[in-house]
Amino acid sequence: MPVITLPDGSKREFAHAVSTLDVAADIGPGLAKACIAGRVNGELKDACDLIETDAELSIITAKDEEGVEILRHSCAHLLGHAIKQMWPETKMAIGPVIDNGFYYDIDLEHKLTQDDIEALEKRMLQLAKTNYDVVKRVVSWQEARDTFAARGEEYKIAILDENISKDATPALYHHEEYTDMCRGPHVPNMRFCQHFKLMSIAGAYWRGNSENKMLQRIYGTAWADKKALSTHLTRLEEAAKRDHRKIGKQLDLYHMQEEAPGMVFWHNDGWSIFLELERFIRRKLNQYTYQEVKGPLMMDRVLWERSGHWDKYSEAMFTTSSENREYAIKPMNCPGHVQIFNQGLKSYRDLPLRMAEFGCCHRNEPSGSLHGLMRVRGFTQDDAHIFCTDDQVQEEVSACIQMVYDTYSTFGFENIVVKLSTRPEKRIGDDAMWDRAEEALKQALRANNIEFTLLPGEGAFYGPKIEFTLHDCLDRAWQCGTVQLDYALPSRLGATYVAEDNSRQTPVMIHRAILGSLERFLGILIEEYAGRFPTWLAPMQVVVMNITDKQADYVQEIVKFFKEQGIRASFDLRNEKIGFKIREHTLRRVPYLLVVGDQEMENKEVAVRTRDGIDLGKMRLEDFATKIHQQISLRSLKLLEE
């Protein structure tokens, strides 16, 4: 007679084993109709799974984030159902949930076209509209293997052979004549899977290994209702307009080419923004009392072996050899910073020691994962490492948190999601050390009035971590900042300091990044601002245009004056109509467009308009310079009169 405890604390007693769907029906027919799955004693279960003992139960519906993830997963199975109807010879590989959607990797000789994708989507909708039940069967490993062997599903067999114990009892989900295998849970009926769209096709190697066969990957998105789907598709359209690769080309910021995959060729205007970002962070480093250092680009393999990176990270490292020695180009800055710390005897009075670097790092990312500035092989990390005592951890982490929020708010990012990853099952150190470390991070977050989500067991083996994820104007999430405690690397690389009692102690190391990769953050900014950078970041802040040749000398004097004032300015003296020139520089997203005619020249004035077409009227040159200087020094996100 299980007693079911609901989230509001109420209890319901049943005379026999019940499913989540049974409990929902006992509460009311509306909830039964909306029920997708259940969280039983903290674990997600299918709506049909029986609950035989007392349990705590949350009923999952499409209003829950988990419910939407489940229906997305079921849409992947629906896609498989449709594919097998249209191309029965298809071999199905994997179909997981991803952010905002799902994909399925398939082995099919026929190369899918956009017309095929549209036909597949239509077939999926036809199937879903029949509102068929999804039937779950838990079977033996052998029965599952026999089922897929009879269907010629070699990839499912490989998953069973290589990833699932023979003692396991896999779950098979039957969509009418189509059968798939999954941990689940899945929707009980396809009425939940009515609002989806297939988005694109790509290539993907089986198991992500380039030595394996290339499969076709079909991406889709799915939502709980028509409105949510429509909102998402509208956001995607806006994201396409803001694509940093497209805007980067339009504004001549950078380019990438086949001969240097994942490496950025910065053009003048793009490099101007990059340097401005660097200057901004450098000011923050001075404000928060950091040393700035510079380590070598590559170091001997021996050092990477001692740090532990060679065992865990060597496949992602670029290497080279010289004079019978093997070197690795650094994928991160931390081992180099420990080497700098180790030079000379350090006392407890020297701690905390905050060491920062704009480190040029390289990682051998798979070519298929490269994506403009967002995923590169060569990047600059605004990395820092703080060497401190246990007692200093909380205060130092608190300062890091303040620096993160101080920095992000300057760029207009106010919606920050914070997660704290705690001790994993396999870890160094005793529970007392982890208790102190985790509590220090929690207290630092609370002291700054930061709400955070705990991720139990998600920390690194060498210490807990705080992650900062910012949300942009399209509500996309970008994980940028991190604060990571490290109790292992200083010890591995022999870092010590002389404590107050003259004993040798190992410092705690705090890994800290604010922007992360400057390249990636610049890509985020391009899309956030749609190329319309605030004045302080804009590569060209002012362009001055003449109406006739008579004003040419005066225009050049104005630009010289601006440059002497530290304002990035240029002139346009082309023999073109002023309307044409205004339009061209508006498309270049230059914040301020200054026009000079005879009257302006005579009165030592400029006619000012913004890139948004707002006419600010005539101003004395010195007055305009004062206003724009104030805007730049405040790092205002708005233009004058906005």
Swiss-Prot record:
Enzyme Commission number(s) from the entry: 6.1.1.3
A molecular-function term among this protein's GO annotations: tRNA binding
UniProt-annotated binding residues for Zn(2+): 334, 385, 511
Entry annotated with the keyword Mitochondrion: no
SUPFAM superfamilies (alphabetical): Class II aaRS ABD-related, Class II aaRS and biotin synthetases, TGS-like, ThrRS/AlaRS common domain
Pfam families: HGTP_anticodon, TGS, tRNA-synt_2b, tRNA_SAD
Swiss-Prot/TrEMBL keywords: Aminoacyl-tRNA synthetase, ATP-binding, Cytoplasm, Ligase, Metal-binding, Nucleotide-binding, Protein biosynthesis, RNA-binding, tRNA-binding, Zinc
GO cellular component, one term: cytosol
Catalyzed reaction equations: tRNA(Thr) + L-threonine + ATP = L-threonyl-tRNA(Thr) + AMP + diphosphate + H(+)
Cofactor binding summary note: Binds 1 zinc ion per subunit.
Subcellular location: Cytoplasm
Domain TGS: 1-61
Region listing for Catalytic, in residue ranges: 243-534
Enzyme class: ligase
Needed cofactors: Zn(2+)
Gene Ontology biological process terms in this record: threonyl-tRNA aminoacylation
Subunit structure: Homodimer.
Protein family according to the UniProt entry: Belongs to the class-II aminoacyl-tRNA synthetase family.
Its biological purpose: Catalyzes the attachment of threonine to tRNA(Thr) in a two-step reaction: L-threonine is first activated by ATP to form Thr-AMP and then transferred to the acceptor end of tRNA(Thr). Also edits incorrectly charged L-seryl-tRNA(Thr).
This protein's name: Threonine--tRNA ligase
Organism (species): Shewanella putrefaciens (strain CN-32 / ATCC BAA-453)
